[in-house]
C-alpha cells in the first residue's frame, strides 16, 4: 500500500526515497519491475513483479479500480473517451487533444454532497494522468489537484487512490483480488 507523497521510481529530486528503492532493499537479488505506476501523490496499491515474464503478463492483464473525490456533483455513471497528449510546452502536464493517444475512463458515482463526489473509476487505457485529465476535461477536477484545476481547500494533494487490483495468476488459471481501504 503506497502512501501519498512517495514516488514509485527514482526521478529528479527523488533518487533514493522511492517505493522502488524499498523494493530493492527488501529483495536485493531482484530487478525492480513496477507493473502499475502511481503518481507521487496518489495513494493505494502498487504491484512489483519478480521477473520480466511476470511483469509482462501482469501489465497487460491487470485490472485496476481507482477511487477519486472530484469537485461538483456527478450522479450515475459515465464514460470519458478523449485522446490525451502532452501539453506542448510541458514535460509534465497532459491535455485532451485530437492528435493524442486514445484514452477511455469509466466512472460511477458512489456518493456526493453539495461540493464533492466520490467516484469509482476503471481505465481501459493507462495514459499518464488519465483520470486527472479526463475528470478536469468534463468539468470535475480532482479535489486538491492544482495541476488540473482542483482546489486545495479540502485536501492538499489530488484525491486519488488505487483501491482494488485484480491480478491474473501468472503460472495458473484464475485471478487474485486485493484491496486497500480509502485513506482518511
What are these model-derived regions, one by one?
Residues 2-88, 101, 112, 159, ...:
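RNA pseudouridine synthases
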Residues 1, 47, 68, 107, ...:
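Residue-level signal for inorganic ion chemistry
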Residues 71, 121-124:
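A structural micro-motif recognizing beta-strand termini
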Residues 90-99, 153:
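Short aromatic-glycine motifs in intrinsically disordered, low-complexity regions
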Residues 70, 106-109, 142:
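Conserved hydrophobic positions within beta-strands
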Residues 101, 111-116, 124, 128-184:
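Pseudouridine synthases involved in rRNA/tRNA modification
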Residues 18, 42, 105, 117, ...:
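Ser/Thr-centric signal marking residues that sit
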Amino acid at each position: 500500500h503506497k502512501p501519498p507523497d512517495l514516488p514509485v521510481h527514482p526521478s529528479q529530486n527523488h533518487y533514493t526515497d522511492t517505493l522502488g528503492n524499498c523494493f530493492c532493499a527488501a529483495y536485493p537479488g531482484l530487478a525492480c519491475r513496477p507493473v502499475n505506476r502511481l503518481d507521487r501523490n496518489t495513494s493505494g496499491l502498487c504491484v512489483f513483479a519478480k521477473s520480466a515474464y511476470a511483469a509482462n503478463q501482469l501489465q497487460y492483464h491487470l485490472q485496476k479500480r481507482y477511487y477519486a473525490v472530484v469537485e461538483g456533483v456527478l450522479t450515475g455513471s459515465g464514460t470519458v473517451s478523449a485522446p490525451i497528449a502532452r501539453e506542448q510546452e510541458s514535460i509534465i502536464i497532459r491535455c485532451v487533444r485530437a492528435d493524442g493517444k486514445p484514452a477511455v475512463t469509466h466512472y460511477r458515482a458512489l456518493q456526493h454532497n453539495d461540493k464533492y463526489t466520490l467516484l469509482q473509476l476503471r481505465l481501459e487505457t493507462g495514459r499518464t494522468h488519465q483520470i486527472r485529465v479526463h475528470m478536469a476535461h468534463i468539468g470535475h477536477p480532482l479535489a486538491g489537484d492544482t495541476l488540473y484545476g482542483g482546489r486545495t481547500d479540502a485536501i492538499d494533494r489530488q484525491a486519488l487512490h488505487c483501491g482494488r487490483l485484480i491480478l491474473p495468476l501468472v503460472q495458473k488459471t484464475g485471478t487474485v483480488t486485493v484491496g486497500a481501504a480509502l485513506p482518511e
